[in-house]
Swiss-Prot record:
It catalyses: L-glutamate + NH4(+) + ATP = L-glutamine + ADP + phosphate + H(+). Keywords: ATP-binding, Cytoplasm, Ligase, Magnesium, Metal-binding, Nitrogen fixation, Nucleotide-binding, Phosphoprotein. Its cofactor is Mg(2+). Its main location: cytoplasm. Catalyzes the ATP-dependent biosynthesis of glutamine from glutamate and ammonia. InterPro entries: Gln_synt_N, Gln_synt_N_sf, Gln_synth/guanido_kin_cat_dom, Gln_synth_cat_dom, Gln_synth_gly_rich_site, Gln_synth_I, Gln_synth_I_adenylation_site, Gln_synth_N_conserv_site. Two forms of glutamine synthetase (GSI and GSII) can be found in this nitrogen fixing bacteria, GSI is a typical prokaryotic glutamine synthetase whereas GSII is similar to the eukaryotic enzyme. L-glutamate binds at N267, G268, R325, E331, R343, R364. The gene is glnA. Pfam families: Gln-synt_C, Gln-synt_N. Binds 2 Mg(2+) ions per subunit. This is Glutamine synthetase. It comes from Frankia alni. SUPFAM superfamilies: Glutamine synthetase, N-terminal domain (SSF54368), Glutamine synthetase/guanido kinase (SSF55931).
Length: 474
């Protein structure tokens, strides 16, 4: 919307903007904000910044060194369609208040450094990313945990388990079965108008949508695909995408979750990520003579993704819930191989006709619980390491990997089965991320400590309700 400070300030004056919503991303990937009146938003903010308490933000500073500085990024500004008073929202970079250097734990800074590193390699000058984020639309969610009990419950007018319940006006049916929600027309698809409204608002905020549809899961699983863009821009778009989806749903009395696996015995929500490298305006992943139309550069890029996948998943699939999705039987990509067209492989080469510009790699493992700034940056660094070191991936497999006999399947490498395992893999394999100081040692150590303490240990130490079913009378 804007390219420089003057554009923002002129728009504020000309359009009678009343508030500036200051946004930045915490380490796990949740957008934070505070709001200031435009009367106190002076031009000096673009040079002197705004201060905030970094010790109160997850994964940031200790209390004895808590002051942090925010500097605006004018290119991220948009008019927030959900605010009662005209508000211009803008995402900021985080800096050290003394040295003014960019903060090493700022996720946006890491994404920016990854793009700078790419240009410095001379391999390519631009990386494009295109995520396909899935989510569930529920009518109601309740959950609780305390030392003596726990529960969670979700519900949806569209849920398969509600075919027999009494509903106001009568139960009219048309509820997708478990794993039976892919592409039905209304009335089975209850939420097509809601997704269209989400699409409309996404366009209003500057995000191009290519498609929206019902996904496989019952109870309102959905997908809205946005247009690819450069790494940092796509990560910004995905954060805004989540904001829009959640708020449109809430305005219609619904609630959305991007949890990878909110339902047992139905498909999880993934986020397939398409990526490609370009140089001087030309695509680098196409060769008419290569397998699947891939160039050597693309093949080595895939080699890097597969070689570093156990460590990479610490950023692309960073929650304990991620590994409830990554299991056989629910269309999840658990096999660390690549293939043309084959959706059961974790790396797929989508059909794009004969157009070199359409040639790309689809990494099917990630899920929308990730911090996109860190996930896309880590993917790029893994792919570049593969190119730089000419890492050949294993031979492609064009069979249906879900139907392989046990002896053949045993030879196919699998994704790690838990967050704990991928964190261990990241601890052992992170040199590729630290190239060019894109991911600092401090960032990696902070990520490992945060995830182990606040997620792995937090889950490990608490009794699970199903354990009572299994063991109460043992």
């Amino acid at each position: 919307m804007f390219t420089k400070a003057e554009d923002v300030l002129r728009y504020i004056r000309d359009e009678d903007v009343q508030f500036i919503d200051v946004r930045f991303c915490d380490l796990p990937g949740i957008m934070q904000h505070f709001t200031i009146p435009t009367q106190v938003f002076a031009e000096s903010v673009f040079t002197d910044g705004l201060m905030f308490d970094g010790s109160s933000i997850r994964g940031f500073q200790a209390i004895h060194e808590s002051d942090m500085l925010l500097l605006p990024d004018p290119q991220t500004a948009f008019v927030d369609p959900f605010r009662e008073h005209k508000t211009l929202a803008m995402t900021f970079f985080i800096h050290d208040p003394i040295t003014k250097e960019q903060y090493s734990r700022d996720p946006r800074n890491i994404a920016k450094k990854a793009e700078t590193y790419l240009r410095g390699t001379s391999i390519a000058d631009t990386a494009y990313f295109g995520p396909e984020a899935e989510f569930y639309i529920f009518d109601d969610v309740r959950y609780d945990y305390n030392p003596y009990g726990s529960m969670h419950h979700v519900d949806s007018v569209e849920a398969a388990w509600n075919t027999s319940r009494k509903e106001e006006g009568g139960n009219l049916g048309y509820k997708p079965r478990f794993k039976g929600g892919y592409f039905p027309v209304p009335p089975t698809d209850h939420f097509t108008d809601l997704r269209s409204e989400m699409t409309r608002v996404l366009y209003e905020t500057g995000i191009t949508v290519e498609m929206q549809h019902h996904e496989v899961g019952t109870a309102g699983q959905a997908e809205i695909d946005i247009r690819y863009d450069t790494l940092l821009k796509t990560a910004d778009n995905l954060m805004l995408y989540k904001y829009v989806i959640r708020n449109v749903a809430r305005s219609r009395g619904k609630t959305v979750t991007f949890m990878p696996k909110p339902l047992f015995e139905d498909n999880g929500s993934g986020m397939h990520v398409h990526s490609s490298l370009w140089k001087d305006g030309e695509p680098l992943f196409y060769s008419p003579n290569g397998y699947g139309g891939l160039s050597d550069t693309a093949r080595y890029y895939i080699g890097g993704l597969l070689h570093h996948a156990p460590a990479l998943l610490a950023f692309t699939n960073p929650t304990t819930n991620s590994y409830r999705r990554l299991v056989p039987g629910y269309e999840a990509p658990v096999n660390l191989v690549y293939s043309a067209r084959n959706r059961s492989a974790c790396c797929r080469i989508p059909l794009g006709g004969d157009s070199p510009k359409a040639k790309r790699v689809e990494f099917r493992v990630p899920d929308p619980s990730c911090n996109p700034y860190l996930a896309f940056a880590a993917m790029l660094m893994a792919g570049l390491d593969g190119i730089r070191n000419k890492i050949d991936p294993p031979d492609p497999i064009d069979k249906d990997l879900y139907e392989l006999p046990p002896d053949e399947l045993a030879a196919v490498p699998q994704v790690p089965g838990s967050l704990e395992k991928v964190l261990d893999a990241l601890e052992a394999d992170n040199d590729f991320l630290r190239e060019g100081d894109v991911f600092t040692t401090d960032l990696i150590e902070t990520w490992l400590e945060y995830k182990r303490l606040n997620e792995v240990d937090a889950i490990r130490l608490r009794p699970h309700p199903y354990e009572f079913t299994l063991y109460y009378d043992i």
